[in-house]
Amino acid sequence: MAKKIIGFIKLQIPAGKANPSPPVGPALGQRGLNIMEFCKAFNAQTQSMEPGLPIPVVITAFADKSFTFIMKTPPATIMIKKAAKIEKGSPRPHTDKVGKITRAQAEEIAKAKMPDLTAADMDAAVRTIAGSARSMGITVEGL
């Protein structure tokens, strides 16, 4: 028989920097999961990634206090900001433009995000990324 699931925990944790302090400790502690075991496993799996890059993770907690976790791709907004070489998006995105990305950069981001996107094909994924960029005040050239 399969293990009984008691809940899902969704967190965004910097790659290679999971530690028992908030938000990780309290979220896992209230479900009775081993916090250090998760931190070691997460840090081991993210050591090849860029340190500090926020990684969304979904932790499945089971009744016997065990857990599994699935890591997603970094948020599109982080990748877009990196491609446009800016610190943050525009406070007024439709009037103040803060940067530019090309269609090729949008395609590269869409390719990386494809497993997590609901887009039917690559063109739809590129349009999704372009929409996110526009909502941040970044112009997408060639689209």
Swiss-Prot record:
One or more lysine residues are methylated. One of its GO terms (cellular component) is cytosolic large ribosomal subunit. The keyword rRNA-binding applies. InterPro entries: Ribosomal_uL11 (IPR000911), Ribosomal_uL11_bac-typ (IPR006519), Ribosomal_uL11_C (IPR020783), Ribosomal_uL11_C_sf (IPR036769), Ribosomal_uL11_CS (IPR020785), Ribosomal_uL11_N (IPR020784), Ribosomal_uL11_N_sf (IPR036796). Keywords: Methylation, Ribonucleoprotein, Ribosomal protein, RNA-binding, rRNA-binding. It comes from the Bacteria. Pfam families: Ribosomal_L11, Ribosomal_L11_N. One of its GO terms (biological process) is translation. One of its GO terms (molecular function) is structural constituent of ribosome. Belongs to the universal ribosomal protein uL11 family. Forms part of the ribosomal stalk which helps the ribosome interact with GTP-bound translation factors. Part of the ribosomal stalk of the 50S ribosomal subunit. Interacts with L10 and the large rRNA to form the base of the stalk. L10 forms an elongated spine to which L12 dimers bind in a sequential fashion forming a multimeric L10(L12)X complex. This is Large ribosomal subunit protein uL11. It comes from Polynucleobacter asymbioticus (strain DSM 18221 / CIP 109841 / QLW-P1DMWA-1) (Polynucleobacter necessarius subsp. asymbioticus). The lineage of its organism: Bacteria, Pseudomonadati, Pseudomonadota, Betaproteobacteria, Burkholderiales.
